[in-house]
Amino acid sequence: MLGWCEAIARNPHRIPNNTRTPEISGDLADASQTSTLNEKSPGRSASRSSNISKASSPTTGTAPRSQSRLSVCPSTQDICRICHCEGDEESPLITPCRCTGTLRFVHQSCLHQWIKSSDTRCCELCKYDFIMETKLKPLRKWEKLQMTTSERRKIFCSVTFHVIAITCVVWSLYVLIDRTAEEIKQGNDNGVLEWPFWTKLVVVAIGFTGGLVFMYVQCKVYVQLWRRLKAYNRVIFVQNCPDTAKKLEKNFSCNVNTDIKDAVVVPVPQTGANSLPSAEGGPPEVVSV
């Protein structure tokens, strides 16, 4: 027994497996499990960190969307509500009505063209009557109305029919009046007026009344065409609405006041003969010649 114990003390690693105690084997098993957990933990932490980095970093597919959204955002500059262009020195923007927001600005030329084409003198949104100064062009510079072929055809047919109808009515009235005058002379001689005279008189009255009504209706159409032609060949200068002009002046004055309040006064050093440095008050320096 003593020899065997001495051999074990000299070489403890050569102990057979069946002779080791269960406590030693349990400690070794716990150590192996902790080592395996330590080996697996870096992989998990790395995967978690990679997931966090993926969630935090923006994907490449969303970058162009953000850029496209920024490009689609509307500009805050004032634009014309007809042509959607900005104003410049040649064609500035005016505020002719009481509309607010982006609909209050319009070009003078765009508004002039719209008034000529629509033949209206008020805003279609707020129904405010424009303050206009009109002036007709010289007759040499008049332009034709912009009409379709069907409208021109209708006008030509109506004028032709009107001329023919007026000619027929005038000729029939002349003939009836002439014959009626002859019958009146014969009746004065005989002392009796026959029934054809009264029949002709009724026909003349009906024809004359119908001719007057027809001429009145046609003349209304011609007057409307004449007004359209005059409106198309006039120079219009629309003035700013007084209400909107006052609001713009108030806003401008408020902005100027805020800019003045926010301005910082920087003191400027005086560079004069009186502002000499304090060192010059001491004894003068001697310069070697």
Swiss-Prot record:
Zinc finger (RING-CH-type): 72-133
A GO biological process held by the record: immune response
This protein's UniProt keywords: Cell membrane, Cytoplasmic vesicle, Endosome, Golgi apparatus, Immunity, Lysosome, Membrane, Metal-binding, Transferase, Transmembrane, Transmembrane helix, Ubl conjugation, Ubl conjugation pathway, Zinc, Zinc-finger
UniProt region (Disordered), positions on chain: 13-69
Region (Responsible for down-regulation of CD86 and MHC class II cell surface expression): 222-279
Enzyme class, UniProt record, top EC level: transferase
MF terms in GO: MHC protein binding; ubiquitin protein ligase activity; zinc ion binding
Induction behaviour: By IL10/interleukin-10. By human cytomegalovirus infection. Transcription is repressed by insulin through FOXO1.
Gene3D superfamilies the UniProt entry points to: Zinc/RING finger domain, C3HC4 (zinc finger)
EC number in record: 2.3.2.27
Catalytically driven reaction(s): S-ubiquitinyl-[E2 ubiquitin-conjugating enzyme]-L-cysteine + [acceptor protein]-L-lysine = [E2 ubiquitin-conjugating enzyme]-L-cysteine + N(6)-ubiquitinyl-[acceptor protein]-L-lysine
GO cellular component, one term: endosome
Amino-acid positions noted as binding Zn(2+) 2 in the UniProt annotation, renumbered to this chain: 97, 99, 123, 126
Tissue expression profile of the protein: Expressed in antigen presenting cells, APCs, located in lymph nodes and spleen. Also expressed in lung. Expression is high in follicular B-cells, moderate in dendritic cells and low in splenic T-cells.
Extent of the signal sequence: none
SMART domains linked: RINGv
Composition-biased stretches (Low complexity): 43-58
Biased composition (Polar residues): 59-69
PANTHER family in the record: LD02310P
Domain notes: The RING-CH-type zinc finger domain is required for E3 ligase activity.
Protein role: E3 ubiquitin-protein ligase that mediates ubiquitination of TFRC, CD86, FAS and MHC class II proteins, such as HLA-DR alpha and beta, and promotes their subsequent endocytosis and sorting to lysosomes via multivesicular bodies. By constitutively ubiquitinating MHC class II proteins in immature dendritic cells, down-regulates their cell surface localization thus sequestering them in the intracellular endosomal system. Also regulates insulin sensitivity by controlling surface expression of the insulin receptor subunit beta/INSR by direct ubiquitination and degradation. (Microbial infection) Plays a role in iron metabolism by regulating the levels of the transferrin receptor TFRC during human cytomegalovirus infection, subsequently contributing to a proviral effect.
Subunit structure: Interacts with CD83; this interaction antagonizes MARCHF1-mediated MHC II and CD86 down-regulation.
Name of this chain's protein: E3 ubiquitin-protein ligase MARCHF1
